């Protein structure tokens, strides 16, 4: 047992002082590194954190019997962009992840918390190119090698800022294992995967329609496109028929692409156009003859029922064109400007071209009408530019074969998602999955390992032998590297010791916004390359919104600076606020919640100072529980502590972080600080007797000290995963075992401490004290003025009150407590009812009788309302038919209690009425 350092609490609670000091303390001790000495788990037991199902069940998947080992607990940080800085969304995720990691560490598990960063191809290249533009330069001015050198220099100077911020939050990854997706080892894994998939026939190159960002000048995956509802127009354009009178009217939202039309499509079921199928129309402005084809993709109810077919600029038209053998004419360049195929409109920006083309159609008499039209328009998720469906050569992954085991994993429960509703979203996407475009027209990233020489093509991690080979200019999608995160961070493709020990991971905690980008793909990669799921569970964090319910964003300016919040309130307060997000619900962030967290930390600070002071330096390490003289208050707080341990642990196991945090908060503040410490004060005061204490008094004092310290120690352990800094500081001030609270054992709910009888008795005591306090306030009697109290009730209640009198009188400032066994009561008194017992506070000469009558009238009115509500419920046949029998029984019990209480209240009203007479 190490002696505490109570002098550390001599200064007021100041998180800005203690938090940096404590983080440095943990790092120096090596707290964040995994400790294989804690357990030696066999392979395959890493996926260990299993929530308890409703009704109970084994909380963990433990190693096989006979191993005597606990499985390692492994979790990875979703790698933030190298350009990133801490947001409230990051704070939420990191607070939850670190809470779990710290808890598992205290449970005696070997924990590995893997940090790392994503090179973030588009985002990082955009940042550096913006810097170059400010210098009147472009990446092309520098050339590829010089540009990449500039990006690496930028990364070394500015990258990783977010990890410094996460340290401030108190997160505990093993920083010695920090990974970067462009590290040499990780890059080797990425390129190895490309070659493996290519050799298996799952990667191919083709000329297809892709999502193209003219600003970033690269292809985007479907998941990188954000659909924005936009007010646009529907232009109705006349397409003259060839060699006959008349025309077809075509409706389009994108007239600028009509220059690339190579057909007009109608529904084969549309009788209006049956005679025109196989004929030709003449493309306005261009005068190109284009066929009229019948295709099932046409909705006869949309627009005119005839649609233009532009195979090079629309994904649906691309498929239609392939079915009918239509030419594919690209009319734009990669920067969104019209090319030579656009004729007179060449060189114009696509939106300027739209305006000019509509004007030309109007002038030539081809424009029939224009209608307002609200529709979804794709935008680049990185720069918010309107994307362009664009025909180009790209590399793709065939996803259907990879998706099959990932679908089965979710359906059979091998991978579980929390909240469970995300399973349906996940399965819908996988069951309708499209091939993944993985090539990007960037320079920053993993360059595609494909080499060309004339007509030859070689897929190789290294340049082929011989001269004349050139490497593919494109790089791989950033997500093509991050989908390997659970095993590439452990050394794959090499068969490393880390990979054997720590794969699969135990849990993934991430945002639901990347369920497709990342989570689903990680599961696919895990099964394909490792033969098993990368983790057993996925917990999806909530969206952080402001007090008005708006999603936090830079554009709205409604996202607070997390560092400023931590400086003002402390990282502990920020963490404690964030983890109280109800599972499956968005978090409405309110700064007042941070104030509450700081008040709580300060409450614990002062309580610990008090306990330290009252312990008087006594060494309690050798005290055995059997030697103690436990009072009712002691038995009650130990029982409540055992229940708190059970509640906090159960809720952590089931990912109910809010309920877990609230359980320890309620116990620490409302029960330990507000009640037990007050009840212990009379025994603490025995120390003032010094040598005059009797042996019994010494035992009473030692017991009060031991229980106060033991329960406070347990509170700090329960709270440590949520509020690590202040709990470590307070724990170090108390006598303790070990060097750090971070490695202290998680509390256990000791069976012998559960004491329902003591809890029931103290509940009655609390009810009486609260009732007397409330009567004082309502009767406007000074808080410090001792008052007499009379109690009338059942014999068992009166016996208990006499037994508890020494506890009740100081807590309620009672001058004299009188139990009325003959049914008498003061003639003029304020009254309350506690569990059927009547509490009377004599008022003769102390209060205004009219005010007391008004108070009783208000209480009676409330009771009548409650009584009518219960009666109405019990008259409801639907309720009686559907409710469980025990629920109906409780309502009947409540009815009886309300009627009895109302009857006693009426008698009190009659008593006051008789006084006036």
Task: Describe each region flagged by the PLM.
Residues 1-49, 53-54, 59-85, 105, ...:
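Non-catalytic terminal extensions that flank enzyme cores
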Residues 2, 12, 21, 28-29, ...:
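Residue patterns forming the tRNA-binding/recognition surfaces of aminoacyl-tRNA synthetases
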Residues 68-128, 181, 190, 250-253, ...:
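N-terminal catalytic cores of NTP/NDP-binding nucleotidyl/phosphoryl-transfer enzymes
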Residues 90-92, 315-320, 482, 516, ...:
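Alpha-helical support elements that line or immediately flank enzyme active sites
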Residues 102-110, 131-144, 164, 168-173, ...:
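Secondary-structure transition/capping motifs at alpha-helix termini
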Residues 110, 255-335, 362, 812-815, ...:
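Catalytic alpha/beta core of large soluble enzyme barrels
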Residues 236, 428-480, 484, 528-571, ...:
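Feature 926 captures the class I aminoacyl-tRNA synthetase adenylation module centered on the KMSKS loop
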Residues 288-293, 473-503, 670, 674-677:
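Active-site-adjacent "gating/activation" loops or surface patches in catalytic cores
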């Amino acid at each position: 047992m190490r002696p505490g350092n109570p002098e550390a609490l001599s200064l007021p609670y100041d998180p800005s002082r203690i938090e940096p000091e404590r983080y440095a303390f943990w790092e120096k001790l090596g707290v964040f590194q995994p400790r294989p000495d804690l357990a030696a788990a066999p392979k395959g037991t890493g996926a260990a954190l299993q929530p308890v199902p409703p009704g109970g069940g084994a909380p963990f998947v433990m190693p096989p019997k006979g191993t005597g080992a606990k499985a390692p607990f492994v979790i990875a940080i979703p790698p933030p962009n190298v350009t990133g800085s801490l947001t409230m969304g990051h704070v939420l995720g990191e607070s939850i992840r670190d809470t779990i990691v710290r808890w598992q560490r205290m449970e005696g598990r070997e924990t590995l918390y893997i940090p790392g960063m994503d090179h973030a191809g588009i985002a990082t290249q955009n940042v550096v190119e913006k810097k170059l533009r400010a210098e009147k330069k472009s990446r092309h001015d520098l050339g590829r090698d010089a540009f990449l050198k500039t990006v690496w220099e930028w990364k070394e100077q500015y990258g990783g800022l977010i990890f410094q911020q996460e340290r401030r939050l108190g997160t505990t990854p093993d920083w010695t294992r920090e990974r970067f997706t462009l590290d040499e080892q990780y890059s080797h894994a990425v390129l190895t995967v490309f070659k493996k998939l290519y050799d298996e026939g799952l990667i191919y190159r083709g000329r297809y329609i892709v999502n193209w960002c003219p600003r970033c000048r690269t292809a985007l995956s479907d998941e990188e496109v954000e659909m924005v509802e936009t007010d646009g127009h529907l232009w109705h354009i006349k397409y003259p028929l060839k060699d006959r009178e008349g025309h077809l009217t075509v409706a389009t939202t994108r007239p600028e692409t009509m220059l690339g039309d190579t057909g007009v499509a109608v529904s084969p079921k549309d009788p209006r156009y049956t005679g025109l199928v196989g004929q030709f129309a003449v493309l306005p402005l261009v005068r190109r003859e284009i066929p009229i084809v019948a295709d099932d993709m046409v909705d006869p109810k949309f627009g005119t029922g005839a649609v233009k077919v532009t195979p090079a600029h629309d994904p649906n038209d691309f498929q239609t064109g392939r079915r009918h053998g239509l030419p594919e004419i690209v009319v734009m360049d990669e920067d969104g400007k019209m090319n030579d195929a656009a004729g007179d409109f060449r060189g114009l920006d696509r939106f300027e071209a739209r305006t000019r083309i509509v004007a030309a159609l109007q002038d030539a008499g081809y424009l029939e009408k224009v209608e307002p039209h609200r529709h979804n328009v794709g935008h680049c998720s990185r720069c918010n530019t309107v994307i362009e469906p664009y025909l180009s050569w790209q590399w793709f992954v065939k996803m259907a074969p990879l998706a099959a085991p990932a679908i089965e994993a979710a359906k059979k429960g091998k991978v579980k998602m929390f909240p469970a509703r995300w399973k349906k979203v996940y399965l819908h996407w996988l069951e309708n999955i499209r091939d993944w475009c993985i090539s990007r027209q960037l320079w920053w990233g993993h360059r595609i390992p494909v080499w060309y020489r004339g007509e030859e093509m070689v897929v190789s991690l290294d340049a082929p032998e011989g001269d004349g080979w050139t490497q593919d200019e494109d790089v791989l999608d950033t997500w093509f590297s991050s989908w390997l995160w659970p095993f590439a961070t452990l050394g794959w493709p090499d068969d490393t010791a880390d990979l054997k020990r720590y794969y699969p991971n135990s849990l993934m905690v991430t945002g639901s916004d990347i369920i497709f980008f990342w989570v689903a793909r990680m599961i696919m990669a895990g099964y394909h390359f490792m033969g098993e799921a990368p983790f057993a569970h996925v917990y999806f964090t909530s969206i952080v919104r402001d007090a008005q319910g708006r999603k936090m964003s830079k554009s709205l300016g409604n996202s607070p600076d997390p560092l400023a919040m931590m400086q003002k309130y402390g990282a502990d307060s920020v963490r404690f606020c964030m983890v109280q997000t109800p599972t499956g619900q968005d978090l409405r962030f309110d700064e007042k919640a941070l104030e509450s967290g700081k008040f709580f930390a300060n409450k614990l600070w002062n309580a610990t100072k008090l306990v330290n002071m009252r312990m008087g330096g006594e060494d309690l390490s050798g005290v055995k529980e059997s030697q103690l003289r436990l009072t009712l208050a002691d038995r009650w707080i130990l029982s409540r502590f055992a229940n708190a341990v059970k509640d906090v642990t159960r809720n952590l196991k089931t990912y109910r972080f809010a309920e877990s945090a609230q359980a320890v908060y309620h116990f620490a503040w409302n029960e330990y600080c507000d009640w037990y410490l007050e009840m212990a004060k009379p025994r603490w005061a025995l120390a003032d007797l010094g040598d005059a204490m009797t042996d019994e008094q010494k035992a009473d004092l030692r017991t009060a000290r031991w229980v106060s310290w033991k329960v406070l120690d347990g509170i700090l352990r329960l709270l440590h995963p949520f509020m690590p800094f202040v709990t470590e500081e307070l724990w170090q001030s108390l006598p303790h075992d070990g060097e750090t609270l971070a490695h202290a054992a998680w509390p256990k709910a000791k069976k012998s401490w559960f004491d329902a009888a003591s809890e029931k008795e103290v509940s009655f005591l609390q009810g009486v004290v609260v009732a007397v306090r409330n009567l004082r306030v309502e009767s406007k009697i000074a808080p410090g003025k001792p008052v007499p109290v009379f109690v009338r009730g059942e014999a068992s209640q009166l016996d208990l009150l006499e037994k508890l009198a020494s506890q009740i009188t100081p807590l309620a400032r009672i001058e004299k407590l009188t139990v009325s066994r003959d049914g008498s009561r003061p003639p003029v008194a304020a009254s309350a009812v506690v569990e059927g017992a009547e509490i009377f506070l004599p008022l003769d000469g102390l209060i205004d009788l009219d005010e007391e009558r008004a108070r009783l009238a208000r209480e009676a009115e409330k009771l009548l309302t409650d009584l009518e509500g219960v009666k109405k419920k019990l008259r409801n046949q639907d309720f009686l038919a559907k409710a469980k029998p025990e629920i109906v029984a409780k309502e009947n019990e409540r009815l009886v209690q309300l009627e009895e209480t109302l009857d006693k209240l009426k008698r009190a009203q009659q008593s006051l009425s008789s006084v006036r007479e």
